[in-house]
């Protein structure tokens, strides 16, 4: 089970044996690259922040010490950071994609399947946001210090501003940038860290026919790889953990880790990064109106609210699973 199996082979059909030291070296190399991607993201945000603050210097200097940036400078910072991150990490992912594990799981989505997939992801997004809100309402009162910190954060203009540009930055630019970074770049590098047998996959030089499915490798490789479930979940946990840590606080980090696992599974199931982006978009956008769904809570009570959440998640997962089921395959 622990080895990377070829689609048409058994566990005994393995390539070169890789020593323990080689495995450790491979894992260290690719995990260092994943951490490097996170550091690059931090550096980009820092550079954009300095540039935006320089442009709005007069307005920023008028803000009392200790207070957060608000108004136009904040919105400009959110938009500029989102665009910069999206351009850099979408570009990096497009470079990695032809030689990626995800590319080998990709299947064609006609318009009908894409519409059903989007509908399923919308249900999941609303259900996940409702579930997070309900769980936090139960858990946060037990930890007053974390509750106060989180309430202050969510009450800040970053999340409460409903201007179009601000909502676009949170609901569109952030999902594109974060999914390209974590479920694209970091997830791919994490898979390489735990699957050293697949080196021919990322060493080959893809031709212009790559996206049409015709592979021309300079390094021989099996026509298809099947990553075992333990290795997938190990790589998925790595990217989700880094996703949670990047959020910078315990409460957001905890549910970002859980969401990262879901986003990773969604992309892996479909073999397409846009599925994770759309789900992330649905989760973030529903943040702005999930409070309005409290009418369900008042009308039906806790049980009714929970039933509504379970129904949304169950319908979303079932529909998405049906849309992305591969013929003759029972794997996730």
In which residue ranges do the predicted regions lie?
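Short, charged juxtamembrane terminal tails flanking transmembrane helices
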Residues: 3-9, 211, 323-332
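C-terminal membrane module of polytopic membrane proteins
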Residues: 281-332
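Short, Lys/Arg-rich, polar N-terminal cytosolic tail immediately upstream
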Residues: 1-23
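Hydrophobic residues within alpha-helical transmembrane segments
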Residues: 238-242, 278, 282
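Hydrophobic core of alpha-helical transmembrane segments in multi-pass integral membrane proteins
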Residues: 38, 82-94, 123-131, 305-324
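Residues that define the loop-to-transmembrane-helix transition and helix capping
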Residues: 233, 251, 271-274
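Alpha-helical transmembrane segments in multi-pass membrane proteins
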Residues: 37-98, 147-148, 306
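Juxtamembrane helix-loop-helix connectors linking adjacent transmembrane helices
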Residues: 57-67, 71, 101-177, 187-227, ...
